[in-house]
A protein has these predicted regions:
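Rossmann-like S-adenosyl-L-methionine
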Residues: 125-235
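Class I Rossmann-like S-adenosyl-L-methionine
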Residues: 1-157
Length: 235
């Protein structure tokens, strides 16, 4: 598959799963029936977003009139439009009260993608330029000097920039954690809950390869993953 095709699959699948209860309702099935009704769900997704339907034999069985009728009913129910299952609506309302509707709506949005520039290998501007050559568009994140927000649908992990270790995918908020520690080259630093090493690698970049950085975690497989990422990052 081409990178753009991979990105499209990720986009559609992600939205279907985030709002599965909505798309099941629009398709006229129960959530437990979703696995056996993939194509009907895909037809509902395309109709909901007013995108041309894929050419598939199941399209003949897609009832546009029934879909529009279900959509009209769904629009009367904000919980359903957000794709929120009943159990989560109950839990969110109990724990967050009046703040829950805004949180629920946010859960239905497509998550933003952020990159952390590996300063051991490039600058933010150099990474932007390199990604642009591979049809990946980005914008700087205000207040987070190491972050870029991806604004295009692209298969990031097939880019040369990723293979060369120029970036890691990391939430902009997470990038602020390492920055708050104010580490500097030559320090001795311990990351006692390293996981797969996103923040560890950020610390390593801030230390410019000088000093000692010890990564620890109770899960050995995560540290093995970190070793591979560290080699790619040149840390």
């Amino acid at each position: 598959l081409k990178p753009q095709e991979q990105a499209r699959i990720a986009l559609v699948t992600g939205d279907l799963l985030r709002r599965l209860s909505l798309y099941c309702a629009l398709t006229g099935i129960q959530v437990r029936q979703a696995e056996k009704n993939v194509w009907p769900l895909l037809h509902s997704w395309h109709a909901f977003h007013k995108i041309a339907q894929p050419n598939h034999p199941t399209l003949d069985r897609f009832n546009e009139e029934a879909f529009r009728r279900r959509l009209t009913e769904a629009k009367k129910n904000p919980v359903l439009m957000d794709g929120c299952p009943t159990w989560l609506e109950k839990l969110g309302s109990e724990q967050l009260g009046e703040a829950w509707p805004a949180e629920r709506a946010a859960l239905a949005w497509m998550p933003k993608r952020y990159l952390r520039v590996n300063s051991l290998k490039c600058t933010r501007e150099e990474l932007q330029a390199a990604l642009a050559k591979e049809q990946v568009t980005t914008i700087p994140v205000e207040g987070v000097d190491s972050a870029l927000q991806v604004t295009s649908d692209a298969a990031l992990f097939r880019t040369k920039a990723f293979a060369d270790g120029w970036f890691e995918q990391q939430d902009a908020g997470s990038q602020q954690v390492a920055a708050a520690l104010e580490v500097s080259p030559g320090m001795r630093v311990i990351d006692a809950c390293a996981g797969a090493g996103g923040k560890t690698l950020h610390l390593a970049a801030m230390m410019e390869g000088k000093g000692r950085l010890l990564a620890m975690d109770v899960e050995e497989w995560k540290l093995e993953n970190l070793k591979q990422r560290a080699r790619r990052a040149g840390a």
